[in-house]
């Protein structure tokens, strides 16, 4: 799923500490180290479905909402329940991105389908270069209070993207990128508090910041039980829009 203050990543003991002297020279080396920091290629490959539960807080929202996020490769459904009882459901079935609110259903026709597929790639840590025209190591820089390897690239759909990996731990600290919708806005996404729930390490606090608006998802549980394809079927209200 992208705070106005410097972020501190809380790392579990399972995250290896790499010697700073062994400076990495290529984007592939940085990404390979990230895969190992998460728990290794085999652990990442085992994730074929995912259910995440937690809370979300955002600018303009008086209290925290709760959410359930379910995903399989290239599909997802996100259900958010606000403190006032209002429910919002968003999803992607591999082709169509949609949202249903109390005001009705709508289809996202602005975001590139490849961007949506990237966001629902459960093995994205293994496939990152596949989504870029180019992705290169731009150097070492400070990002949100961390000394980071900085990767810079352009996606296949023409968006600028910057990734920051902690020099000490190899873990992803955050992104700074051009939004995937039609807006030219630059967004920042931070990944904090890494934990394992029986699979690869997961950032359990994910904060997205665009301008003066902030949204933070806090994960309380992550499970990898299989999910039926029916979970990701289009709601009837969305199907009506396609007729």
Task: Please name every model-derived segment.
Residues 2-9:
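Sec-dependent signal peptide recognition
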Residues 19, 81-83, 144-238:
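Gly/Pro-enriched, hydrophobic low-complexity segments
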Residues 22, 29-105, 131-137:
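N-terminal mature ectodomain segment of secretory-pathway/periplasmic proteins
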Residues 68-73, 93-96, 112-116, 166-168, ...:
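A short, sequence-level motif marking secondary-structure junctions
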Residues 98-124:
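Acidic/charged, solvent-exposed loop-and-adjacent secondary-structure segments enriched in E/D, K/R, S/T
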Residues 115-150, 171-176:
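Short, conserved active-site entrance elements at the starts or edges of catalytic domains
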Residues 242-243:
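Short, solvent-exposed mixed-charge patches
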